């Protein structure tokens, strides 16, 4: 039996997408939105991210910080918050109006303070949601996602990676 998931990996962006038919999960009636294409979350905006940190792997934890800058070349945000081991790959959110949030990206890494070599304080790297939008737009069904996963996909180019 084939696995009921499709995986798209982009090693250069430290990003992956796992697509699974909704019948296997209790998804909300209205899913969270993605930050619109071409929009950047403003510097200073409060953001949060979720994950299962290695220090408490059975508990979903929420972390918060503020956008420090936008890195155009990396298509990523730096946020002044901690992303401890185990949180990478988790979603990052921002509030767009009362009781409504959008996904702005994915937790990718934590950059320690290079001046002192200390782990804290540091910056969290949040990869932009654009890579996810490209993959989702290119899919018409779960079957098309499954067919496209035979080789790891480059999310940035939306084509198979070369070995």
Where would I find each of the regions flagged by the language model?
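Serine endopeptidase catalytic core focused on the charge-relay Asp
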Residues: 1-72, 104
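Short, solvent-exposed secondary-structure boundary/capping segments
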Residues: 17, 74-81
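Short intrinsically disordered coil segments
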Residues: 31-37, 80-83, 141-142
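Short, well-ordered alpha-helical segments in soluble proteins
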Residues: 51-54, 71-74, 96, 110, ...
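Conserved short-loop catalytic and cofactor-binding motifs
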Residues: 55, 80, 120
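Short glycine/serine/proline-enriched coil/turn segments at secondary-structure junctions
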Residues: 55-59, 86, 115
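Catalytic nucleophile loop of clan PA
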Residues: 81-107
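C-terminal cap/linker of serine protease catalytic domains
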Residues: 103-163
């Amino acid at each position: 039996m084939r696995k009921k998931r499709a995986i798209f990996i982009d090693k250069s962006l430290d990003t992956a997408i796992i697509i699974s038919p909704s019948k296997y999960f209790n998804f909300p009636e209205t899913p969270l939105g993605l930050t619109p294409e071409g929009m950047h979350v403003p510097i200073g905006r409060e953001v949060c991210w979720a994950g299962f940190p290695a220090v408490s792997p059975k508990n979903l934890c929420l972390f918060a910080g503020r956008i420090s800058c936008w890195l155009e070349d990396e298509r990523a945000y730096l946020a002044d918050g901690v992303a401890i081991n185990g949180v990478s790959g988790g979603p990052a959110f921002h509030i767009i109006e009362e009781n409504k949030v959008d996904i702005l990206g994915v937790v990718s890494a934590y950059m320690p303070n290079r001046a002192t070599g200390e782990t804290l304080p540091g910056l969290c790297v949040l990869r932009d949601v654009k890579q996810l939008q490209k993959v989702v737009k290119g899919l018409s069904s779960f079957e098309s996602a499954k067919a496209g996963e035979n080789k790891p996909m480059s999310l940035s180019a939306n084509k198979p990676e070369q070995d």
